[in-house]
Regions:
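N-terminal export/targeting signals for secretion/compartment entry
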Residues: 1-83
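Residue-level hotspots at or immediately adjacent to binding/recognition sites across diverse folds
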Residues: 15, 40-43, 58-417
Length: 417
């Protein structure tokens, strides 16, 4: 692989799941043009031309952070306007915990298709959501795994994906139909379009069936909430008329977390909507090594923990500081350098790429690299996208033919102990 190819593949690891672009890390905070393309769904299929364009608009990314990233601890005070950066607190003192070993197992794929992905998982580890790539021109069959049992769903349109699932097996996501994204739910074994949106997507579902996502209006998005799968979506209030964005997490207490920005060129802010209504609280950005972060982009909400990445711009270099935010205490905590969280669990543990080579699990005990099918680590294109609250089950994918010119991604469950 050439240096240019390596750079492109590394960039694609940070985009939404496809067989040739394994992991989803939101580049909207780094490249607003990439946000515009994703919203218009022009990145839903990758071509050689698309790779060149994406590489051209990218900026240098340098991973920073780690336990020494922040000064002395200080709680973060949410606000609805600009605020001083919040200092990242040292990691909480807790007893060491978490798995010390994992094994990888391919998930069964109906039809035996060579390429498949995991796109989400539930907090208990029982359910995983994903999709396969039959290449028959009918889009991507959605798969729900209940343990080792796999069920395939043929949804209308193309680019079908379920991105989250709860402990009851309710899965949410979207399809691309009639030249626009449309939100979908699978409940009790039956797929259905979510009501109230002409165009949009569902991004997360709570234990009690609340669903969040975004309404699509041209190139803009506005965060929405479905109180249940049968009730029409309602837009969540924003700080002003130019603001836009999407909700990315919801819990059974009614707390919603989202990523919003003031106009197409505004910096990304993490927003929190509490139960009972009212405008969003805008979390301050953390202080990181070298000064205040430019942005903090949330990726997931689970058990009161928001996991994501902070960015600090230093000239033409954008530095990345993985971090998590605890809603109950109002504190940021740094995550070790080299870990880029793609999902978190109810204990604040995260999974994601490690040092551009492996997928990893970060717990209070440290970082555990996830093995390949033969128990090794260090081969490119291992991707983790979901982690159960006890970290016993991690969903993701592996390149099962490493060293070849093209990636052959296969849906994987890591069982950890």
């Amino acid at each position: 692989m050439t240096a240019d190819e390596d750079r492109i593949v590394d960039l694609l690891r940070r985009l939404d799941p496809e067989p040739v672009r394994p992991v989803r890390v939101d580049l909207t905070a780094a490249v607003h043009e990439a946000r515009r393309r994703r919203r218009s769904r022009r990145t839903m299929s990758v071509s050689a031309a698309g790779l060149a364009v994406l590489a051209a608009v990218s900026v240098p990314l340098v991973v920073g952070g780690g336990p020494s990233a922040g000064p002395a601890s200080q709680p973060a005070s949410p606000s609805t306007s600009g605020s001083a950066p919040a200092t990242i607190a040292p990691p909480a003192t807790t007893a060491p915990g978490g798995p010390t070993a994992c094994t990888a197992q391919p998930l069964p794929v109906p039809g035996g298709h060579a390429k498949s992905l995991v796109t989400g998982g539930d907090p208990t580890g029982r359910f995983l959501a994903g999709r396969s790539y039959p290449g028959d021109g009918r889009g991507n069959p959605v798969i729900l795994w209940d343990g080792d049992r796999a069920r395939e769903y043929r949804l209308p349109g193309s680019d079908q994906r379920m991105v989250d699932v709860n402990a009851a097996g309710v899965a949410v996501g979207s399809v691309y139909l009639d030249d626009r994204p449309q939100p979908y739910v699978i409940r009790n074994g039956r797929p259905a379009r979510l009501p109230g949106l002409a165009s949009g997507e569902a991004t997360a579902v709570s234990a009690d069936g609340r669903i969040v996502g975004a309404r699509q209006i041209g190139d803009r998005q506005r965060p929405v909430l479905w109180s249940d799968p049968d009730t029409a979506a309602v837009e969540l209030p924003l700080p002003g008329p130019r603001w836009e964005g999407t909700a990315i997490g919801v819990d059974s207490a009614g707390t919603v977390v989202g990523k919003i920005h003031d106009g197409p060129s505004g910096v990304t802010r993490t927003a929190v909507w509490r139960a009972g209504g009212g405008g969003p609280e805008l979390l301050p950005t953390p202080s990181v090594e070298g000064g205040p972060a430019s942005e903090f982009v949330a990726h997931s909400l689970r058990g009161g923990w928001i996991t994501g990445v902070a960015f600090r711009d230093e000239g033409k270099v954008r530095r990345i500081y993985p971090a998590r935010y605890h809603l109950a205490t109002g504190r940021y905590e740094p995550l070790p350098s080299g870990v880029s969280p793609s999902a978190g669990n109810g204990r604040g543990w995260v999974v994601g790429p490690v040092d551009r080579m492996d997928a990893g699990l970060l717990t209070d005990a440290g970082t555990l690299r996830l093995p390949d099918l033969d128990g090794r680590t260090g081969r490119y294109a291992a991707v983790a996208v979901s982690v159960s609250d006890d970290a016993a089950v991690i969903g993701g994918q592996l390149d099962v033919e490493p060293g070849q010119k093209s990636l052959v991604m296969r849906a994987i469950r890591w069982s950890c102990r």
